[in-house]
């Protein structure tokens, strides 16, 4: 009985530590997202909207189609990584990033660089770049503006060449832009 009680205490301790680690991870993701949004003068809710929409789209994809065999853990990882989708905007000139009205073609070319900047930032994290969260965040950063017909950027990927993580976040990002003021 003593051994069982000790085992239960250890299991509770490990469980508490895992929950604390997850909470800290979520907190860091939110802090980084807020830094980018603060600089970009976005609503501050954009990243939260993207995460919620990504979760909803993934849930629908898994439940209603046979197109993807994503596990609940993979869905959670994609939703968490979605917060990094615009992290590369931190490298874009604020005058362009916050310009009211239509961008010139040259300015739009600069804005498009945020996908490559974000992917590069994540790729330079040598210590963590093999971590699943960073790999998925890289895919999302780089390819969330790709289009199924191949007319997106930065690489002009076509159809299923676009990772499912980037496809889902792309839909969430466009939807949020359409419903936001």
Residue positions per predicted region:
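Metal-dependent catalytic cores of enzymes that make or break cyclic nucleotides
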Residues: 37-181
């Amino acid at each position: 009985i003593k051994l069982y009680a000790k085992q239960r205490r250890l299991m509770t301790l490990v469980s508490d530590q895992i929950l604390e680690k997850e909470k800290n991870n979520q907190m860091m993701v939110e802090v980084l997202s807020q830094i980018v949004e603060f600089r970009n003068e976005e609503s501050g809710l954009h990243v939260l909207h993207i995460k919620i929409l990504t979760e909803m789209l993934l849930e629908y994809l898994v439940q209603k189609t046979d197109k993807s065999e994503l596990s609940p853990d993979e869905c959670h990882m994609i939703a968490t990584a979605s917060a990094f989708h615009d992290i590369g905007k931190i490298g874009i000139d604020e005058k362009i990033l916050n310009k009211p009205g239509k961008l010139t073609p040259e300015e739009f070319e600069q804005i498009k660089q945020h996908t490559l900047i974000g992917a590069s930032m994540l790729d330079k994290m040598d210590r963590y770049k093999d971590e699943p969260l960073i790999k998925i965040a890289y895919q999302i950063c780089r390819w969330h503006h790709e289009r199924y017909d191949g007319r997106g950027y930065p690489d002009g990927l076509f159809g299923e060449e676009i990772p499912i993580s980037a496809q889902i976040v792309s839909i969430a990002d466009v939807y949020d832009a359409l419903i936001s003021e």
